[in-house]
């Protein structure tokens, strides 16, 4: 099969995935109705103010961990093992990582559904650009080029749909949740079921483990705050683990090396 056929096949797969996600959303939406945002989501544990200036300081300031990870990726960008067709996906991932720090800090400064949009939007783009890069490593290199914009548009659509539905009085998080959970599951399955084209898989595993720990901290925000005697909340630790996960991904892109075709199929 020649390069033209490969490119056409990858594009078909990309749009098949996008269509399947849209169909799954439609089925679940018709079957179960909208999934509203829990109003209690904004009632986070750490409400302390820093120097009388920074409200909810723990959750605001720990976004520095995410910013540091994004800047780490930016510093490594020119030294990453990345094919030309994957450069755009890497640039999107780095930019969205930096924007996640600012979007999250903005949300935690004044937690509302309106500000939460700017937290979730770059997160969705991070996840979908990462999925494109992992599929490039595990399925076909052209996924990095051909999937990055359709995938990130799909992720952004989940956030925008939720924002619009909230404004209309019937919030629906369903598509965003499919993107958020589905991306993690898809990456885990790709790591288990498909052979890599590059070394360094351990760093992707580290990112996935960080994601699992992050979810734990998010779920037990108040409990962690109580157990640490009010030192740090679960949500603040979530931000730290996001930074660890992103740094692990960027280090994977930096240290990985291309495997031979024979080795990658073992």
Language-model features and meaning:
Residues 151-155:
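Active-site-proximal alpha-helical scaffolds that flank and shape metal-associated catalytic sites
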Residues 157-198:
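Active-site rim beta-loop-alpha module in soluble metabolic enzymes
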